[in-house]
Amino acid sequence: AAAKNIKPNIRVIGVEPVGAPTHFQSRAAGKVIKLDKVDTRAGTLAPKKTEILNFELIQEYVDDLILVDDMSMQKAAEWLWFEFGVAAELSGAASIAALSDKVFETGPRNVCSIICGSGTDGIP
């Protein structure tokens, strides 16, 4: 929300695990839904149901939601560790996984990826 308020023309893309598409499916349904199950190692990205406030904020400020699999997040976390010494958990490496897998077209523009979480589930 803050980034969009500062620069309204930026494109914000959310990333979720294939095995826990809570926001992705809620957006498609146009309302908050509850998943029957989640199947991902990225635990902090795996709620069965989101809160209405989160849903509303995503509807307003996130331009697109994309899905990445656990293996892609694992590879991204390993890359961050071995190349930069950054210990990111799988959830924190999700945006790098999306960029690495070229899940969406970035084109010739600046890209900012938020990397968070200092868990060790992504480090071999």
Q: For each predicted feature, which ranges?
A:
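Glycine-rich phosphate/pyrophosphate-binding loop at beta-loop-alpha junctions
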Residues: 1-60, 101, 106-124
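Active-site-adjacent helical/loop segments in soluble small-molecule enzymes
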Residues: 51-108
